[in-house]
Amino acid sequence: MNKFLEKVGVSIASRIGITAAIALIAAAVLGGGYWYVTSRAPRETVKSAESGTKVDVEEMAFYGTGSLRVSGKVYRPANTLDEKRPAVIYCQDTSYGESWCRELAGAGIIAYCFDFQGDGEKARTRELETVLKGIRNLRHADKDRVFLLGEANGCLTAATVAFANPKQVQGLILVSPGFNPLEISRKAKRYKGTVLIVDDALGRKANLEEIRGFVY
């Protein structure tokens, strides 16, 4: 069993214990595939450019069915692991997402960004759904306040996943979408969440205030 745990991710066993790790993997397998989270110490602490608030940054990977592995970084207000907070998943390359996530965390929000690995919308959708499941299960994330933030080309993937998972995604944030969101929203009859369209031309400070009001 130790060799199996080492193969699928020994870090989870070291963080929560062998027995808990076995139980988590078994439960997930029975549910149609397993996922788990890995973290690499040490955590990095940075400051929000807008608020000056300290932000903890930690590498985190989510695993889905088969060989799917999605790697990224989670940003949260420093020293707030015991507090439930809304979470935003950024959908676009991390080169853009890291600054967004740092400022979102500075505004009191848990934020996660990652690089899509697969080609095509189907692969990107699968990766984002894996991240969504993982973020909803973080102990410091409020699973009833999870939002997807898409920017530019990432808007389509964010909208697709939000509309396909209406009970898991409480709201959709679109920054400079490359399509008319009304065209997609007409097809999203089951989606009960709200949609916020952000005009990036207004500036980051105004955008952050609008997003914070939206998720809180």
Predicted regions and their residues:
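N-terminal Sec-pathway targeting helices
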Residues: F4-L24
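N-terminal cap/lid segment of alpha/beta-hydrolase-fold proteins
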Residues: A41-L81
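Short beta-strand element of the alpha/beta-hydrolase
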Residues: E83-D93
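Conserved alpha/beta-hydrolase
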Residues: A107-G120
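Alpha/beta-hydrolase active-site loop
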Residues: G120-R139
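Short beta-strand immediately N-terminal to the catalytic nucleophile in serine-hydrolase-like folds
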Residues: L148-G150, V175
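Gly/Ala-rich beta-loop-alpha elbow adjacent to hydrolase catalytic centers
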Residues: G150-A158
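The feature captures the conserved acid-bearing segment of alpha/beta-hydrolase catalytic domains
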Residues: G171, S176-E209
